[in-house]
């Protein structure tokens, strides 16, 4: 068995046969690949598919149970890379993982540069307060006034963080890809805090991540990698659109 794992999760489509896992475009020597799902129709030659029980009505909550808490599920691995299910691995990631975990036990994409080359400033945000306003703006401008979450929940969460002294312009993670030495004590403490904040607040996990790592004092790294323009990961946007249209 390897000591490094790449993992993803896919919940909420247990009766649907349209969804699939993206097979990496390169050899993943030294890595195990694991997918957690409630869908018995998901099959893959590249990924070990682990069929697990759902605990929440909202599949996003089950997804985050695995996304946020790898130390509960991968005690036998030293290093984990979590990728969203709509991410295709396009090149060997050994060097980039080693680089970004050389001095930190956790590294995550920096939202302030994500989309900067192709989608412009609209997608570049560096603060949970900006993110909350952006979510409201998206919903207000949606033809059916469709919001990514209940805005009362979001604004109450943000208000709580503000009253606790959480600063503005303190960074924003894009949690599409996360590198971790997940069994280290400082990471475990921060991830358990993140889970508690996520579990009882908004389903938008990027709102609770910065607060959790700030509150626990985790020394982590924002990776200067644009998910829309890099050599290691490709966001399969069409797959995402098709998946969301079936919700």
Located regions from the model:
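N-terminal anchoring/stem segment of glycosyltransferases
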Residues: 1-64, 73-77, 200-204, 215-218, ...
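A contiguous pocket-lining binding segment that forms or flanks enzyme active sites
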Residues: 116-156
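Extracellular structured ligand-interaction cores
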Residues: 30, 82, 174-175
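Short acidic (Asp/Glu) patches
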Residues: 61-69, 95, 151, 155-162
């Amino acid at each position: 068995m390897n000591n490094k794992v790449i993992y993803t999760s896919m919940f909420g489509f247990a009766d649907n046969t349209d969804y699939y896992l993206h097979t990496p475009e390169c050899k993943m020597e030294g890595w195990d690949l694991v997918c957690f799902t409630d869908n018995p129709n998901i099959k893959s030659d590249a990924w070990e598919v682990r069929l697990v029980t759902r605990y929440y009505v909202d599949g996003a909550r089950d997804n985050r149970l695995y996304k946020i808490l790898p130390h509960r599920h991968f005690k036998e691995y030293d290093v984990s890379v979590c990728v969203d299910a709509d991410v295709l691995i396009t090149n060997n990631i050994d060097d980039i993982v080693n680089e970004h975990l050389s001095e930190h036990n956790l590294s995550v994409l920096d939202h302030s540069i994500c989309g900067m080359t192709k989608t412009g400033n609209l997608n570049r945000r560096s603060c949970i307060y900006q993110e909350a306003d952006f979510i409201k703006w998206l919903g207000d401008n949606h033809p059916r006034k469709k919001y990514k979450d209940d805005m009362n929940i979001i604004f109450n969460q943000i208000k709580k963080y503000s009253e606790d002294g959480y600063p503005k312009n303190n960074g924003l993670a894009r949690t599409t890809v996360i590198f971790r030495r997940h069994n280290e004590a400082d990471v475990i403490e921060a991830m358990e805090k993140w889970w508690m904040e996520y579990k009882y607040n908004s389903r938008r996990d990027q709102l609770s991540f910065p607060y959790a790592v700030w509150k626990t004092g985790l020394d982590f790294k924002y990776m200067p990698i644009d998910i829309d323009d890099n050599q290691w990961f490709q966001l399969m946007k069409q797959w995402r659109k098709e998946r969301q249209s079936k919700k």
